[in-house]
Amino acid sequence: MAKVCSVCGKGKVSGNQVSHSNKHNKRTWSANLRSVRAIIDGAPKRVKVCTRCLRSGKIERA
């Protein structure tokens, strides 16, 4: 299972980490994922969901 939200598809994003001296280093930011048991197709299943989808009630927890 990838590090991607199973509801909205949110995953890693890349960008630059900028220091005080303005040096740029490539880095990635990961989505804030939680492994939860959710009702999917009428049966409980363990899926990775981002906290934004959890808070907005886009899934029904088991």
UniProtKB/Swiss-Prot annotation:
Protein's UniProt keywords contain Ribonucleoprotein: yes
One Pfam family matching this protein: Ribosomal_L28
GO MF assignments: structural constituent of ribosome
InterPro entries tied to this protein: Bacterial_rp_bL28, Ribosomal_bL28, Ribosomal_bL28/bL31-like_sf, Ribosomal_bL28_bact-type, Ribosomal_bL28_sf
GO biological process, one term: translation
GO cellular component terms, semicolon-separated: ribonucleoprotein complex; ribosome
Keywords: Ribonucleoprotein, Ribosomal protein
Chloroplast among keywords: no
HAMAP family the record matches: Ribosomal_bL28
NCBIfam families in the cross-refs: L28
Assigned protein family: Belongs to the bacterial ribosomal protein bL28 family.
Protein name: Large ribosomal subunit protein bL28
Lineage, uppermost ranks: Bacteria, Bacillati, Bacillota, Clostridia, Peptostreptococcales
The encoding gene: rpmB
